[in-house]
Curated annotation (Swiss-Prot):
Residues 721-747, 811-881 form a coiled coil. Catalyzes the attachment of valine to tRNA(Val). As ValRS can inadvertently accommodate and process structurally similar amino acids such as threonine, to avoid such errors, it has a 'posttransfer' editing activity that hydrolyzes mischarged Thr-tRNA(Val) in a tRNA-dependent manner. ATP binds at K530. It catalyses: tRNA(Val) + L-valine + ATP = L-valyl-tRNA(Val) + AMP + diphosphate. A motif ('KMSKS' region) lies at residues 527-531. It comes from Clostridium acetobutylicum (strain ATCC 824 / DSM 792 / JCM 1419 / IAM 19013 / LMG 5710 / NBRC 13948 / NRRL B-527 / VKM B-1787 / 2291 / W). Monomer. It is an enzyme of class 6 (ligase). This is Valine--tRNA ligase. PROSITE patterns: AA_TRNA_LIGASE_I (PS00178). GO terms for molecular function: aminoacyl-tRNA deacylase activity; ATP binding; valine-tRNA ligase activity. ValRS has two distinct active sites: one for aminoacylation and one for editing. The misactivated threonine is translocated from the active site to the editing site. The C-terminal coiled-coil domain is crucial for aminoacylation activity.
Length: 881
């Protein structure tokens, strides 16, 4: 009587991955309840942009979060992983504009309403596409609580926060310098700027001193911006320019009089040491302008053409104007020289256009008072970065924070909740659309045309997704969340903003830990990009190798904060591991007998191999649980891999095969139960990283839980700890490996059995005696005996030395003696090199004096061991000769 479902002969993830995911969802395993008797564990999924398909970075993000959430679910937490997507204001708008352009349409001709209809169509399609990709990866997220940053409930949260900030005096409208994209005609955040190396020029220009026959020479990479110059700055310590400070210069071509100001900002060694100051078109110049009360002259229109009031240059494109200005400077004798200069140019990451720093009227959030408690929270350990080094980046940004420009001149996004009375000019800030002006009662109101920066709504993600500002059970139970998993590239733009938004709106930090991961690079370490054509579609990988293999490769290759390299052979190796687990599980299930198992279920008359594997498995439970707590997910996965592949599959299963095929029913029953227990625990520990294969096998095992996904995480049992059995088995395994190696080197086939004679110290003998029967099966021994002295070994015996014993086998009738001497000579050379290394270390006074006593002693023990091994090898060579 077997009573176990037979598994398919071959591992084929396509046969069960989709089926299992559908079943998980139908059963509601990923939908936690509000249960005050259980602890919650919450992760908010960083919402991917709805601009296209997911890439390997998203796959890594999902795999790490899913590992954490699955482990916590099994550990008895009400584990919520809340998924969603980001509307990605400018990125989506640019993509949809490109789409309608293919139809011969443009945004302005369509009008706001029609264009937004198209964006919503796009949104619907891409949200479903993203969810489909995530489900393929096996994410155990609760899609019943799914959110989108443009949902009605999130829009309500956005408006509430905007009004609250405004009423608290933290939101204001003002003219400040910001990044401007002339193509998209909107302000941009620093996160949307991509810097590219450009071969440009330094134009050296004379600025004449008023009323004198002298000039100051400046150097600029943007000569067209001289139209907005309002000063030239020099360093007050620069002797070359001291006499000019306070004098007026005459701006070439325009004749505008501008002062020479002294400012420490100027680097005396760079360029000419004199800097033209254009406060309206350079962030550094803007600050200099504020310090010296300089006029801000905006010389560009929103589309990058020159404004009216600049003579013949007005109406020209900025680069057309550059050529004309340089030509005129040359003609009028102001151009001194042109030097080649390589510099970084800021471009809009969505449209590729070169951005212009420009003073414009925008809405801003005052950051100083919001940043302070957010800095203190991390310093106090309320939110911890993993790895810790990333808190320095966080502090650096927060301590030097500038006011945040939150308005964007776009159509797709959260419309700014501000209305202007067209009759009296009153500004009305309101959560709901006002019917009349609060000042003059006029109904002639117009809403601000701008939308909010995408990060404004993303900053509210940890609590807006739980229904805030409305009070409800979810918000009370699942907030604050536990862990945020994200890449190091958005610490400033997203993580920091969530921290201060959480403290400001909820009174506490939004998450306890921030797990930072690196980028997924190609095999050569290059960043994956369209231009390099080295991107990898996770769905293609899943189609070829299965989701479990991809997840395993991404997680085992990962350490917090570090980049990883994607290599196909690593995914292939992960698939081979899955295949190994599949075949081993199938073998176990084919041989288990439920009736015999039940009969001997509580019997603990374990063999040495049983005690060893139970002790090792028990240690693994404690180690892996500890690794997960420390966010060492890659280490945890590697440990499970090593145990399952080496100790369970390669050794334990082989060690118990004679029992399984034997006649002793009681021994069988005990072995069956150990096999079942260890396989189940191994699958449970592997489940967070390889959920599909572990679930499929678990269903065939017929475990006590409906699904492995909701099974109880294994616990450490002190009674199973058995160091004696572990030490004994380790010595036996090393000896068997050594015998196998010798036989392989000498080309002795398994069919040719040989006696094995063991010489060992008294303290090790018991271990070998306990496991001597294992040598017959796994070391192809015809018999095993123990020698009182090495002299008892037959002259024609080949030897092998391990840490615990010297093994002799009369193989000379079966081997080539010359080759054996050659092998031992190589072993002798290796041991001599090791002895030399240890002696060198122990003769180093610095090492002996500074290293801990235990480390020095360990080296001495090693040295003695190697010397004994060398002696034994030399004896065998002499005997053979």
């Amino acid at each position: 009587m077997k009573e176990f479902d037979e598994m398919a002969k071959t591992y084929d993830p396509k046969e069960f991955e989709d089926r299992i995911y559908k079943w998980w969802e139908e059963e509601g395993f990923f939908t936690p309840k509000v249960d005050k008797n259980k602890k919650p564990y919450t992760i908010m999924m960083p919402p991917p942009n709805i601009t296209g398909k997911l890439h390997l970075g998203h796959a890594l993000d999902c795999a790490l979060q899913d590992f954490m959430i699955r482990a916590k679910r099994m550990q008895g937490y009400e584990a919520l992983w809340l998924p969603g997507q980001d509307h990605a204001s400018i990125a989506t708008e640019v993509r949809v504009e490109k789409e309608i352009l293919k139809e011969g349409l443009n945004k302005k001709e369509m009008g706001r309403e029609k264009f937004l209809e198209r964006v919503w169509d796009w949104t619907k399609e891409y949200r479903e596409r993203i969810k489909g990709q995530q489900k393929k990866l096996g994410v155990s997220a609760d899609f019943t609580r799914e959110s989108f940053t443009m949902d009605e409930k999130l829009n309500k949260a956005v408006r509430t926060v905007f009004v609250k900030l405004y009423e608290d005096g933290l939101i204001y409208q003002g003219n400040r310098i910001t990044n401007w994209c002339p193509k998209c005609q909107t302000a941009l955040s620093d996160a949307e700027i991509e810097y590219k190396e450009d071969q440009g020029f330094f134009w050296h220009i004379k600025y004449p001193v008023e009323g004198e026959d002298s000039f100051i020479e400046i150097a600029t990479t943007r000569p067209e911006t001289m139209l907005g110059d309002t000063a030239v700055a020099v360093n007050p310590k620069d002797e070359r320019y001291k006499e000019f400070i306070g004098k007026l210069l005459v701006l070439p071509l325009l004749g505008r009089k501008i002062p020479v100001v002294a400012d420490d900002y100027v680097d005396m060694e760079f360029g000419t040491g004199a800097v033209k100051i254009t406060p309206a078109h350079d962030p550094n110049d803007y600050e200099v302008g504020k310090r010296h009360d300089l006029k801000e002259i905006v010389m560009l229109n929103n589309d990058g053409t020159i404004k009216e009031g600049f003579g013949k240059y007005s109406g020209m494109d900025r680069y057309e104007a550059r050529k004309a200005i340089v030509s005129d400077l040359k003609e009028e004798g102001y151009l001194v020289k042109i030097k080649e200069h390589v510099h970084n140019v800021g471009t809009h990451d969505r449209c590729g256009n070169i951005i212009e720093p420009m003073v414009s009227k925008q809405w801003y959030v005052k950051m100083e008072s919001l940043a302070k408690p957010a800095i203190e929270a991390v310093k106090a350990g309320k939110t911890k970065f993993v790895p810790e080094r990333f808190d320095k980046i966080y502090f650096n940004w927060m301590e030097n924070i500038q006011d945040w420009c939150i308005s964007r001149q776009l159509w797709w996004g959260h419309r700014i909740p501000v209305w202007y009375c067209k009759d009296c000019g009153e500004i009305i800030v309101s959560e709901k659309e006002p019917k009349a002006c609060s000042k003059c009662n006029s109904e002639n109101l117009e809403q601000d045309k701008d939308v909010l920066d995408t990060w404004f709504s993303s900053a509210l993600w940890p609590f807006s997704t739980l229904g805030w500002p409305d009070k409800n059970e979810d918000l009370e139970y699942f907030y604050p969340t536990d862990t945020l998993v994200t890449g190091y590239d958005i610490i400033f733009f997203w993580v920091a903003r969530m921290v201060f938004s959480g403290i400001y709106n909820m009174g506490e930090v939004p998450f306890k830990h921030v797990y930072i991961h690196g980028l997924v690079r190609d095999a050569e370490g290059r960043k994956m990009s369209k231009s390099l054509g080295n991107g990898v579609d996770p769905l293609d990988v899943i189609d070829t190798f299965g989701a479990d293999a991809l997840r395993f490769m991404l997680i085992t290759g990962n350490a917090p904060g570090n980049d990883i390299r994607y290599k196909t052979e690593k995914v292939e190796a992960a698939r081979n591991f899955a295949n190994k687990i599949w075949n081993a599980s199938r073998f176990v299930l084919m041989n288990l007998d439920k009736e015999i198992m039940d009969k001997y279920k509580d019997l603990e008359e374990y063999s040495l191999a049983d005690r060893w594997i139970l002790s090792r498995c028990n240690s693994l439970v404690r180690e892996v649980t500890d690794n997960i707590e420390k966010f060492e997910l890659g280490i945890a996965s590697q440990k499970v891999y090593d145990f399952m592949w080496n100790e369970f599959c390669d050794w334990y299963i082989e060690l118990v095969k004679p029992v399984m095929y034997g006649e002793d029913e009681k021994a069988k029953g005990i072995a069956y139960n150990v096999l079942y227990k260890v396989l189940t625990v191994g699958l449970q520990l592997l489940h967070p990283v390889m959920p599909y294969i572990t679930e499929e096998i678990y269903q065939h095992l017929g475990g006590e839980y409906k699904a492995i996904a909701i099974s109880a995480w294994p616990t450490y049992e002190e009674k199973l700890k058995n160091e004696t059995s572990e030490n004994a088995m380790n010595q036996i395994i090393e000896a068997i490996k050594s015998i196998r190696n010798v036989r392989a080197e000498m080309n002795v086939p398994p069919s040719k059995k040989a006696k094995v004679m063991i010489f060992t110290e008294a303290e090790n003998k018991a271990a070998f005696e306990m496991g001597e029967h294992y040598f017959e099966k796994l070391a192809y021994a015809s018999s095993v005996s123990f020698l009182k002295s090495k002299d008892e070994a037959p002259e024609n015996a080949v030897s092998s030395v391990t840490k615990g014993a010297e093994l002799f086998m009369p193989l000379l009738d079966l081997i080539d003696v010359t080759k054996e001497i050659e092998r031992l000579s190589k072993e002798k050379d290796k041991l001599k090199a090791e002895i030399q290394r240890v002696d060198k270390k122990l003769s180093n006074k610095g090492f002996v004096d500074k290293a801990p006593e235990s480390v020095v002693e360990a080296e001495r023990v090693k040295g003695e061991k190697y010397k004994k091994m060398l002696e034994a090898v030399e004896e065998r060579i002499a005997a053979l000769k």
